[in-house]
């Protein structure tokens, strides 16, 4: 999923798939026991797909279409936490089911969506191999924190493949700007897909 962000409509199902990855949850301080609560909030706040109106517009949809996007839903959550069952603000109705200790979950979810937005914008731009190497390194650092030996194995493998690809590009003198599709295929080509599936729950590090 992460290496297809520029093409993504950001449906709820994709974000929930990411949240099924232990290494991603660890990076954003989200516990497995938090997932049912997050599922309930996402559904209750009316989130369906799309980061925001601007991201939807990039897919050729009307510019002002913000409703049922992630930003729309998160604003409902934050407003509901702030005012409870109070009146709406700026056309947004508060989602008032958030309170108590669970409210601390809002921050990590906002941080995840913010990180996905930044990554989406960066990955959409063609770049020379050196810049791609930095982007891929940042992607691993921003989204994943190994919480066990299995996670650590795959993240190390991905980092080694990144370095090998960069060395190959340098050895052949490749300095042209490359699109994401080319980089994605080159980086992941060396992964042992069988081990990847075995070592990460639910398909896990979803590149």
Summary of predicted features, one role per range:
Residues 1-207:
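Polyanion-engaging groove/track-forming segments
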